[in-house]
């Protein structure tokens, strides 16, 4: 499989001037144990070195052509790498390029020597050719070349690993109109609707949900841990309604519905610009003693990107639009933020849009605008008040060239809360994962990728419950969701359907087999 993949990509790589040695090491070295590996690993690089994919295509030519621009991007994003790290990366790349040129020259000479030897053998008998001074000189030169090449290959591997360990942490380029700074510098580009007015003090979504018996978050630490929740009755129907409403709208607009794996290899995460082996990380890792290098996805974006990994899209199908509803898993390591409620939870349902376009900013920017318009349309039909933000440099992460967030008003919280995000990743992800398209002339080129939240269910639920609450405790259902709930209002049950009978309560009910005095 590795050999066939190398044959597939080699014409493209050769045209781009990138050389991959194509050595599959999976049969030469045993797999290293995740349990014993202590150094910081680059799973995407290892994935390629083991022969599963080609080495990520680093656009180091652009970095070296304008190092000041690359350093400026590092400074503005305030990420893991700083401008002071850039010279070492450039130096390593230049050293590796020179070494590979030396190897190429020696290998070409070795092939020429071998060809000359074959010609002599074809024209003379074996006994006679052994005495030929030209033959002896060629054999001596061949041995000398092999001796020169022997130490160069491990040097190449060492430099290559050193380069990828650092260069894969370089961020994407940044849109010139992106605000500079942290999230406080986000630019409001649009406001939709008005804040709902109440004749009473609005309640938070958790209080509303508990009184309506549609959300349960209490007494779950021994069941599913902190930051977990149940949705019941109308709460569950709201979730299903939001998913079906969103999917129906997007499928009618030409999106292809997808389901994706929840468990994915670390290389796919890193190809998307995420770091599953960081410490701390928001990504859940499966026990490596049983399943090496599997992680729970925090967004369907990873699975959708993995679907296109090492594949080319037909030119006539561009732009490709995909939509997927999935369960997302996030560690939410900063437990000091939003410890209760549905705003920050370990698992939730989300509908995600993902697009693949041809090259050039014009096409991917148009698709980003389209995704953003769909987000606005969905939230408007749900009757929410929200604002669209152009996110600043420190909020872009590694992959985003430009990013827009939408924050919905949440009256119970008394502030806006993020409900969607949309990012143009240009060719950042496709260069790492080899997401490509085939032109009408049969040429392979890197595609652009765009991703956007269509509906993050728990946060939209917060906005809906808090914005549509009534004085009597009921909640009005938006017209767009009424067909899925079969009602226009959610009301409290007439009795208590489930009563806690466990320990740690003042008046514990008597269980079977217990005496009244116990």
Curated annotation (Swiss-Prot):
Major localization class: mitochondrion
GO annotation, cellular component aspect: mitochondrial matrix; mitochondrion
Subcellular location: Mitochondrion matrix
InterPro entries tied to this protein: aa-tRNA-synt_IIb, aa-tRNA-synth_II, aa-tRNA-synth_II/BPL/LPL, Ser-tRNA-ligase_type_1, Ser-tRNA-synth_1_N, SerRS_1_N_sf, SerRS_core, tRNA-bd_arm
SUPFAM superfamilies per record: Class II aaRS and biotin synthetases, tRNA-binding arm
Transit peptide: 1-34
Keyword GTP-binding: no
Keywords per UniProt: Acetylation, Aminoacyl-tRNA synthetase, ATP-binding, Ligase, Mitochondrion, Nucleotide-binding, Protein biosynthesis, Transit peptide
GO biological process, one term: seryl-tRNA aminoacylation
EC numbers, comma separated: 6.1.1.11
UniProt-annotated stretches for the region Disordered: 497-518
Modified residues (N6-succinyllysine): 195, 337
Free-text comment about domains: Consists of two distinct domains, a catalytic core and a N-terminal extension that is involved in tRNA binding.
Family indicated by similarity: Belongs to the class-II aminoacyl-tRNA synthetase family. Type-1 seryl-tRNA synthetase subfamily.
Protein name (record): Serine--tRNA ligase, mitochondrial
Species whose genome carries this gene: Mus musculus
């Amino acid at each position: 499989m590795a050999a066939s993949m190398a044959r597939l990509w080699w014409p493209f790589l050769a045209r781009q001037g990138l050389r991959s040695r194509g050595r599959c090491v999976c049969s030469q070295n045993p797999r290293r144990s995740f349990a014993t590996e202590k150094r910081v690993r680059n799973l995407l690089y290892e994935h390629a070195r083991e022969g599963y994919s080609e080495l990520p295509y680093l656009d180091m030519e652009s970095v070296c052509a304008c190092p000041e621009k690359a350093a400026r991007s590092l400074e503005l994003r305030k990420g893991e790498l700083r401008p002071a790290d850039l010279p070492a990366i450039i130096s390593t790349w230049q050293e590796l390029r020179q070494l590979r040129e030396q190897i190429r020259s020696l290998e070409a000479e070795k092939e020429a020597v071998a060809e000359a030897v074959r010609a002599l053998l074809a024209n003379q008998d074996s006994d006679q050719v052994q005495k030929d001074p030209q033959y002896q000189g060629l054999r001596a030169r061949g041995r000398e070349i092999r001796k020169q090449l022997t130490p160069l290959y491990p040097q190449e591997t060492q430099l290559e690993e050193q380069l990828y360990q650092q260069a894969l942490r370089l961020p994407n380029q940044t849109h010139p109109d992106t605000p500079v700074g942290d999230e406080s510098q986000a630019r409001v580009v649009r406001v939709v609707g008005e804040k709902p007015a109440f004749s009473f003090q609005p309640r938070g979504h958790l209080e509303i949900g508990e009184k309506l018996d549609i959300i349960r978050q209490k007494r779950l630490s021994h069941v599913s841990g902190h930051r977990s929740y149940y949705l019941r009755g109308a709460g569950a129907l709201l979730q299903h309604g939001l998913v079906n409403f969103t999917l129906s709208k997007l499928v009618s607009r030409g999106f292809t519905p997808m389901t994706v794996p929840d468990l994915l290899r670390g290389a796919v995460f890193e190809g998307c610009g995420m770091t599953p082996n960081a410490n701390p990380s928001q990504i859940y890792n499966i026990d490596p003693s049983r399943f090496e290098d599997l992680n729970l996805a925090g967004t369907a974006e990873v699975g959708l990107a993995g679907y296109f990994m090492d594949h080319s899209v037909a030119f006539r199908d561009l732009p490709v639009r995909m939509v997927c509803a999935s369960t997302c898993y996030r560690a939410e390591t900063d437990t000091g933020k939003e410890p209760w409620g549905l705003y920050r939870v370990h698992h939730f349902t989300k509908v995600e849009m993902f697009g693949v376009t041809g090259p050039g900013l014009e096409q991917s920017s148009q698709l980003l605008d389209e995704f953003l318009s769909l987000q606005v349309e969905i939230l408007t039909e749900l009757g929410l008040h929200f604002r669209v933000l152009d996110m600043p440099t420190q909020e872009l992460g590694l992959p985003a060239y430009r990013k827009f967030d939408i924050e919905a008003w949440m009256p119970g919280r008394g502030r806006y809360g993020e409900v969607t995000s949309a990012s143009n990743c240009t060719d950042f992800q496709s260069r790492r994962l080899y997401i490509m398209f085939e032109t009408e002339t049969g040429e392979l080129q890197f595609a652009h990728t765009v991703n956007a939240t269509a509906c993050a269910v728990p946060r939209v639920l917060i906005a809906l419950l808090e914005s549509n609450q009534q004085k009597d405790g009921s909640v009005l259902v938006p017209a767009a969701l009424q067909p899925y709930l079969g009602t226009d209002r959610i009301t409290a049950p007439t009795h208590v359907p489930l009563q806690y009978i466990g320990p740690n309560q003042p008046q514990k009910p008597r269980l079977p087999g217990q005496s009244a005095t116990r």
